Structure formats: structure tokens, C-alpha cells
């Protein structure tokens, strides 16, 4: 892990070895590669495994399939099963012979009828602009996405020669009032930080991951 800042923004580079490039979650038997940074929001850090009930942690999570979607287009079920059949409701205007047999690609559908996307769930949004999510947690089973206004972290990942390189970038101190769920990296301060890596080929997902204990990041003045 490496980090640097210019007084306004901070960037963190995470590099790790992985024998396989797992970048799809379309099938239920497939799992992604991913990496996350966890920041303690308390000077006395809570349990490093997702925080504690009275102590929030802020998490930045990069996901390989989101990066692949941005590079090559949203991975949909037709990409995995190209010969699938798509049924449509019969039309009272056209005969069955005249009805076009379209596809069911998510990006071409009305979000109203794609429950998660229509409800504003960022995980279900096929048009998401970044391969990273800003999350918070205060103990096991409490992980949730921060509101859209807080999704200000940028990230970019590259897999080459059995190695991942992922860069996270964000302003040191987000504008607006101080929020208890967002880390503020003030100049001259020290913040507890931990890391997690998911290996899709090992069927890692959710709490099955490789984690570190708390480390310390010092924001040089």
C-alpha cells in the first residue's frame, strides 16, 4: 500500500498478487475479485472487522466487475448465455408472427421495472460511473451504502501479470458539515486504516475475505 497527497486530494495505491482475473458476477457460481479500505472514524479504533455498534467505520470498496463494465460495457446475462430465449407479453395489436423477439438487456429497460435500479440501489445500477462504492458499517450485518452525495471516491484498477493495481482518489476533507459517517483526512492527523482483499477464484464474498488489522496513515502537513 502506498499513499500520497497534494494538500487537497489523497491517492492510495494497493497492489497484490492474484493468479486469476475474476471479473463477473452474472452467474450465481461466479465471484468477483475486490479490495477495500476501511477507515476508523474514532480516535480509539473499534474492532477492525466492520466496526462496533457505537463506532462507525467508513469503507471504500473497489470491485473488479464494475471496472470491467466500465471498460467493455455492462456484463449482462446475454453475454454469458448468448442463445437464451426472451419471452414477451403478447400484443393485442400485432400478430405473434409480427412481434419482434428482442433481448432483455438491462441497460435498455425501464428502471421502474428493474426493482433494485428503480429503487436507487447503487449495486443494481448498470450506468454507475465509478467502480467503487463508499460504505459504512457499525458491526457485522450493518454494511450499507452512503447516500449518492457521498459517493465522491474515484478509483481505477488494472490486472496484469497476475497482479492487481488499484488506485483510490478523493479530496482530503469533503465540503459541507462534518458527517459522522465520512472520514475526514485533516493535514497533520493520523487515522487508523485497515484493508481487505477478496479472491473470486477462492469463492470469497461478503465476510469471506483476507483482512489486515488496523494500520496507521499519517497525513503529512
PLM regions with names:
Residues 1-2, 7-13, 19-23, 32-37:
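N-terminal ectodomain recognition module in secreted, GPI-anchored, and membrane glycoproteins
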Residues 1-2, 153-158:
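Beta-strand-rich interaction surfaces with strong enrichment in secreted/lumenal proteins
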Residues 5-9, 159-164, 184-189:
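A short, structured loop/turn motif at beta-sheet edges
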Residues 9-16, 164-170:
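Short, well-ordered beta-strand segments enriched in hydrophobic/aromatic residues
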Residues 13-23, 172-181:
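Charged, amphipathic alpha-helical segments
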Residues 27-128, 175-221:
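Acidic/polar low-complexity flexible segments
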Residues 115-149:
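Surface-exposed, low-complexity/disordered Ser/Thr/Gly/Pro/Asn-rich loops and linkers
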Residues 152-154, 163-177:
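Surface-exposed interaction patches
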Amino acid at each position: 500500500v502506498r499513499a500520497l497527497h497534494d494538500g487537497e486530494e489523497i491517492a492510495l495505491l494497493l497492489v497484490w498478487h492474484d493468479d486469476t482475473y475474476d471479473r463477473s458476477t452474472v452467474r450465481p457460481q461466479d465471484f468477483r475479485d475486490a479490495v477495500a479500505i476501511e477507515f476508523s472514524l474514532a480516535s480509539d479504533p473499534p474492532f477492525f472487522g466492520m466496526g462496533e455498534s457505537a463506532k462507525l467505520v467508513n469503507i471504500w470498496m473497489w470491485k473488479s466487475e464494475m471496472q470491467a463494465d466500465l471498460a467493455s460495457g455492462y456484463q449482462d446475462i446475454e453475454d454469458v448465455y448468448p442463445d437464451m430465449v426472451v419471452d414477451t407479453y403478447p400484443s393485442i395489436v400485432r400478430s405473434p408472427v409480427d412481434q419482434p423477439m428482442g433481448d432483455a438487456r438491462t441497460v435498455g429497460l425501464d428502471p421502474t421495472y428493474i426493482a433494485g435500479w428503480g429503487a436507487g440501489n447503487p449495486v443494481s445500477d448498470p450506468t454507475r460511473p465509478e467502480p467503487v462504492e463508499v460504505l459504512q458499517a457499525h458491526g457485522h450485518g450493518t454494511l450499507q451504502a452512503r447516500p449518492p452525495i457521498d459517493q465522491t471516491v474515484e478509483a481505477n484498477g488494472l490486472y496484469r501479470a497476475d497482479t492487481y493495481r488499484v488506485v483510490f482518489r478523493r479530496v482530503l476533507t469533503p465540503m459541507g458539515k462534518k458527517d459522522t459517517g465520512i472520514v475526514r483526512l485533516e493535514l497533520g492527523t493520523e487515522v487508523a486504516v485497515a484493508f481487505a482483499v477478496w479472491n473470486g477464484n477462492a469463492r470469497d464474498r461478503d465476510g469471506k475475505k483476507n483482512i489486515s488489522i488496523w494500520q496507521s496513515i499519517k497525513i503529512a502537513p
